[in-house]
């Protein structure tokens, strides 16, 4: 009897350390799998830069920043953002509208995003890095405890387990970018997402979907990037899309053909 009880408790403990199946489905309603872009349609430069962005490059992460400075009306310039970077001092954040800027300019904000220097236009030349979105309000946006986001992942229709620690946030309202950066890093590490076929990059198409209980879902074609360099590859985050982290989960669909 004691052995049976111990076995049951061990099973429960192991289950809680991985992402459960949460309101998932084997196919996304947002984008048909046949419409997903194939990895072979990306140029080699773009594929290499996607790998660099999501796996190797450090991210801009900070809390409780404030700035009234701008370069253009759809930007906010954070002077002295980098304190120990080899090249950059300032961070120029670009949004797709002035309305978004007005929500954050002069307010206490938190930042989490992928930044780049090559082809960054604005600020002090060679001393300013650029980033699209990645901004949330600081005040009254902190969870009482860190949120670990459950992930459902299917590879060619077969569900694979994803550790529950893979994607997490301490924010009530979080940018999709923050969650997406963490998820794609895992996909690169586990599945060589942005490797070429020669270097064991077996995944040929993919879709990531961010679901919440109260808002429309947000989805990205994992190989749907435009252009070759960070200034265009990262433009999907320019809308600074945020979602409520409560009762949310992520669905990922990967295909090897």
Curated annotation (Swiss-Prot):
It comes from Staphylococcus aureus. This toxin seems to be coded by a bacteriophage. It is found in: Secreted. One of its GO terms (cellular component) is extracellular region. Changing residue 251 to A: Loss of interaction with the beta chain of HLA-DR1 through the zinc-dependent site. InterPro entries: Enterotoxin, Staph/Strept_toxin_CS, Staph_tox_OB, SuperAg_toxin_C, Superantigen_bac, Toxin_b-grasp_Staph/Strep, Toxin_bac. Keywords: Disulfide bond, Enterotoxin, Metal-binding, Secreted, Signal, Superantigen, Toxin, Zinc. The gene is entA. It comes from the Bacteria. The lineage of its organism: Bacteria, Bacillati, Bacillota, Bacilli, Bacillales. Monomer. Interacts with MHC class II molecules alpha/HLA-DRB1 and beta/HLA-DRA chains. The interaction with MHC-II molecules occurs at both zinc-dependent and zinc-independent sites. Interacts with T-cell receptor beta variable 7-9/TRBV7-9. Binds 1 zinc ion per subunit. The zinc ion is necessary for the toxin interaction with MHC class II. GO terms for molecular function: metal ion binding; MHC class II protein binding; toxin activity. Staphylococcal enterotoxin that activates the host immune system by binding as unprocessed molecules to major histocompatibility (MHC) complex class II and T-cell receptor (TCR) molecules. In turn, waves of cellular activation, cytokine production, and migration into the lung tissue and airways occur via alphabeta T-cells. Also causes the intoxication staphylococcal food poisoning syndrome. The illness is characterized by high fever, hypotension, diarrhea, shock, and in some cases death. This is Enterotoxin type A. Its cofactor is Zn(2+). Zn(2+) binds at residues 211, 249, 251. Disulfide bonds join 120-130.
């Amino acid at each position: 009897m004691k052995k049976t009880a111990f076995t049951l408790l061990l099973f429960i403990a192991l289950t809680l350390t991985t992402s459960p199946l949460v309101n998932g489905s084997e196919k996304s309603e947002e984008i048909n799998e046949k419409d997903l872009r194939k990895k072979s349609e990306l140029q080699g430069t773009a594929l290499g830069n996607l790998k660099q962005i999501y796996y190797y490059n450090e991210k801009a992460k900070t809390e409780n920043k404030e700035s009234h400075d701008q370069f253009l009306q759809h930007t906010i310039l954070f002077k002295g953002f980098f304190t120990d970077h080899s090249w950059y001092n300032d961070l120029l954040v670009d949004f797709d509208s002035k309305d978004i800027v007005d929500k954050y300019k002069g307010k206490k904000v938190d930042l989490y995003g992928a930044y780049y220097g090559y082809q960054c236009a604005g600020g002090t030349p060679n001393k300013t890095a650029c980033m699209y979105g990645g901004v949330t309000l600081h005040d009254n946006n902190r969870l009482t405890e860190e949120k670990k986001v459950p992930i459902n992942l299917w590879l060619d229709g077969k569900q694979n387990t994803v550790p529950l620690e893979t994607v997490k946030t301490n924010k009530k309202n979080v940018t999709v970018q923050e969650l997406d950066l963490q998820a794609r890093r895992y996909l690169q590490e586990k599945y060589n997402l942005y490797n070429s076929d020669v270097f064991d990059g077996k995944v040929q198409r993919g879709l990531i979907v961010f679901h919440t209980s109260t808002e429309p879902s947000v989805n990205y074609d994992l190989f749907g990037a435009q252009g070759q360099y960070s200034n265009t590859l990262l433009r999907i985050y320019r809308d600074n899309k945020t979602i409520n982290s409560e009762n949310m989960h992520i669905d990922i669909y990967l295909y090897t053909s």
